Curated annotation (Swiss-Prot):
SUPFAM superfamilies: CheY-like (SSF52172), Methylesterase CheB, C-terminal domain (SSF52738)
InterPro entries linked to this entry: CheB-like (IPR008248), CheB_C (IPR035909), CheY-like_superfamily (IPR011006), Sig_transdc_resp-reg_Me-estase (IPR000673), Sig_transdc_resp-reg_receiver (IPR001789)
Name of the gene encoding the protein in the UniProt record: cheB2
Gene Ontology MF, one: phosphorelay response regulator activity
Additional remarks: R.sphaeroides does not have a cheB in its group 1 operon. Part of the second chemotactic pathway (cheOp2); there are 3 operons encoding multiple homologs of the chemosensory proteins in R.sphaeroides. This protein is essential for chemotaxis, and is able to partially complement an E.coli cheB deletion mutant.
Native species: Cereibacter sphaeroides (Rhodobacter sphaeroides)
Protein name: Protein-glutamate methylesterase/protein-glutamine glutaminase of group 2 operon
Free-text note regarding domains: Contains a C-terminal catalytic domain, and an N-terminal region which modulates catalytic activity.
Amino acid sequence: MKAAADRLMAARAREGRTRVLIVDDSAMVRQALALGLSTDPRLEVVGTASGAEAARAQMAALKPDVVTLDLEMPQMDGLTFLRSYMESAPVPTVVISSLTRTSGETAMRAMEAGAVDIISKPSLGAGQGLPAIMRDVCARVWAAARARLALPDGAAPAPVAPGASEDWIHALGASTGGVQALSRILPFFPAQSPGLLVVQHMPEGFTAAFARRLDALCRMRVREAADGDLVLPGLVLIAPGGLRHMEIERAGGVCRVRLVAGAPVSYSRPSVDRMFLSLAAAAGPRVSAALLTGMGRDGAAGLLAIRRAGGRTFAQDEGSSAVFGMPLAARDLRAAEEILTLDDIPARMMLAAAADTRAPSLASND
């Protein structure tokens, strides 16, 4: 009788848990991920697979809510496998990959194929830091399972002719779903738009590949930011992933990038909040900033600081967000003067810069 009751309680405990399938050719990595993910009560590891064919069978049998996928596997590589099931039976997928230059480029193609997030494969020798790493992995896998797999269809936004002065600055912050969102909207900023700064939550090393992919798509030049870079018209600077925060300082009438050490903020480094807060101090009323799709709260407080400094602030709406977490936090703080569809954000940012007007006061929205 007690055994039956225990089974019933266990079954009830599993209800509502996110079902995870782990796909990796390394038995050691599969075991480490399974153990780590199982520490989160929201997650249930329902299976593991060493390659594409085994994974395909388990996906059909187990119906996972989310897949973690290694890109470098024998027989069929992870990218080819991802493309195959995203076309026929899409499942939210988190790429968990070791970093090489080749894997960075492949990871970007995986995001274009529909993967929701990229995580650098945890080092099994991380020692005391491994639990913190796995907490972040658990949170991102859980969030990925809730992400929309495709942006809503819609007409592409029309480019807006630049009309702002050279010292205006645009800024964007994003997390889960941000690679796809940024790839969609950045090409619509004209070549001589005001300098544009981006923090996208991404592991160390992958942002360089992301910048190269965007540079091929965009009218503006795009590259990974370096310490001391000037914020210039026509240039998009992507915060390097993983190790440091990107802040902006004004000196001698110009704004420069500073890459600074510091603990993660809202579990993130680089942090959107750190960039936005520095922009509020350095450029205040000559900033237009938008907070895009992502889990958590990073960026909401910084967006509010920009608004209070007289800058123009926007957030992505729920309908076009893969994960409506960061924009929701901004809405709850009343940090965004407008909540917009993703496709409307470039035009509104450019119009705000061209008008060069201060944001409406917070009191005006009461």
